[in-house]
Amino acid sequence: MKKERLDVLLTVQGLAPSRERAKRLIMAGQVLVNEQRVDKAGATVPADAVLRVVGEDLPYVSRGGLKLAKGIAAFGICLAGRTAADIGASTGGFTDCMLQNGAVKVYAIDVGYGQLDWKLRTDARVVNMERTNIRKVTPDMLDHAPDFASIDVAFISLDKVLPVVRTLLSPEGEVLALIKPQFEAGKDRVGKNGVVRDPAVHEDVIARVLVAAEGLGFVPRGLTFSPVKGPKGNIEYLLYLGMQGGRTAIADEEIAAVVEEAHRTLDG
């Protein structure tokens, strides 16, 4: 049986108006192939596969924007008139959300290539820094020090990224970091298919990230959970940090309460 790229087939079947839109739907996890979710736009599938688009149309180029949107709402973050950095930009869901919330410039930084959505690539407010490892970025590479940075990275611990981010931010800078237990816990604590389900491991991971952040001089300002799971089904958490002022600690009891609510909400 002949195979086609999923984004092409979705467009040919009239389920998306363009390949760019098809890619966004696929990467948002909204496309089922023979009732199985596929989230890789370049995946090849049988030409006679039954495709179905599910869920509501996203307000951002990817569902990553929903994560940042929750952080903005939960913590009252204001991005109007600010310069921001989207670290681990990928398709640009966070970047899109930043722009829609008034950011005047966004540095979209990602080690990958060709992932950033076309509408963001062509937006004059976006500086596309693809093929760029955040650990190699220095302040002189940015025209303006970001006032805000989001961090959504994979296969690396936040304790390797936060030190670099601190050197890039303005003195009043803020950070919203996505804590992913599967990349923070040791391999022996990661379960089948790369999923960490144990709430105790989640609590420990969050506590250790907090210690690392505070050791760098960041001030914890808030903690909540992501409204959507990661691609493999991992629950993720949003940690809000400042460079000065604000709160001084997030107690173990608060961490436990956030983890419990996350599991109750997302795992039912």
Please describe what each predicted stretch is.
Residues 31, 104-107:
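Short beta-strand element of Class I
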Residues 159-176:
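A short glycine-rich, Lys/Arg-flanked "PGG" loop and its adjoining helix->strand segment in the class I
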Residues 80-90:
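Conserved class I S-adenosyl-L-methionine
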Residues 235-268:
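Flexible, glycine-/basic-rich loop-and-beta segments that form/coincide
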Residues 181-198:
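Short, glycine-/aromatic-enriched active-site segment of Class I SAM-dependent methyltransferases
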Residues 97-105:
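Conserved S-adenosyl-L-methionine
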Residues 107-160:
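S-adenosyl-L-methionine
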Residues 1-49, 83-84:
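A basic, amphipathic helix-loop patch mediating RNA/tRNA/ribosome contacts
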